[in-house]
Amino acid sequence: MERICFLITLVFIFLLTSCNNSNKPVYATDSFKKGETIYKTLCISCHNVDPRKDGILAPNIAGANYELIKSMIMTGKHHKGIEPKWPDAKMAPLPHLKEHIPDLHEYLKTFK
């Protein structure tokens, strides 16, 4: 009986440690980490720290596709699918981030 209780306890502990309530991948790639750093350093002044929520000035961008992210960063123009939170809000183009677009996409695609 003690042996069965011990095995049940082990299985229960294994199941609990296997649960992941996070929206981030269990294994974060370097690209994911770079994207997270860039987002939390440069984007949260307008977007929310949680990309699924609207920010102070800008809408949520969770799960945005690569082309949309690229276009917004390179031109700053609003596109179908992401509407400005304020009618006159404009995003400044950030062409210096061109090489980091894949990193931002890697991070944002985890928030769907």
Where in this protein do the model-derived segments appear?
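A mature extracytoplasmic/lumenal domain signature
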Residues: D50-P51, N65
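Electrostatic cytochrome c docking/interface patches
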Residues: C19-I38, D54-L57
